[in-house]
Regions:
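Bacterial Sec-dependent signal peptides at the C-terminal "C-region" and cleavage site
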Residues: 10-25
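Acidic, Ser/Thr/Pro
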Residues: 21-158
């Protein structure tokens, strides 16, 4: 009896350790925001699972412009991934950010190095680089968008 209890306790401890190695986070991605910071640092080759739901309007007030996380079956040059549906859920890993200050005007210009990838409604993606994970909409003209996607992000802590 004592041995069985020890084995059960050991099994629970191992299960707890395995569960602790997985991080599950819910992120709201507004359709009218350029990018949403997940707060998650990833490494190159790490697999991350995404499950998204919700509806966006790619043109507020136009019911014909509604789409889910897989996007609207249209491609334009005004989107980060031109070979994927307009309005689809996408991601990027920001590798580095450089801030340059103009000596004459004093204005700061931000330049970032990032790797982009498609997500859609559900996918498992191997991270293309080490850096910070952001989620966004596959569209560059976002001022007239409405709605949001709710995205569950599951990562293995490495």
């Amino acid at each position: 009896m004592k041995r069985r209890r020890r084995l059960t306790l050991a099994g629970l401890l191992v299960s707890g350790l395995l569960l602790a190695a997985v991080e599950n986070r819910t992120v709201l991605v507004p359709g009218n925001a350029a990018w949403t910071d997940t707060g998650i640092e990833v490494i190159q080759g790490q697999e991350v699972e995404f499950a998204a739901e919700g509806t966006l309007s790619l043109q507020k007030g136009n019911p014909q412009a509604d789409c889910g996380p897989d996007g609207y079956d249209l491609r334009t040059l005004q989107q980060p991934l031109t070979d994927r549906n307009l309005g689809a859920l996408i991601g990027k890993v920001v590798i580095g950010i450089t801030v340059i200050k103009d000596a004459k005007t004093g204005q700061e210009k931000t330049d970032e190095a990032a790797e982009f990838f498609y997500i859609g409604a559900r996918s498992r993606v191997e991270m293309p680089a080490k850096g910070r994970l952001f989620l966004g909409i596959n569209e560059l003209v976002i001022g007239d968008n409405a709605g949001e996607f709710t995205v569950t992000v599951v990562t293995d802590r490495e």
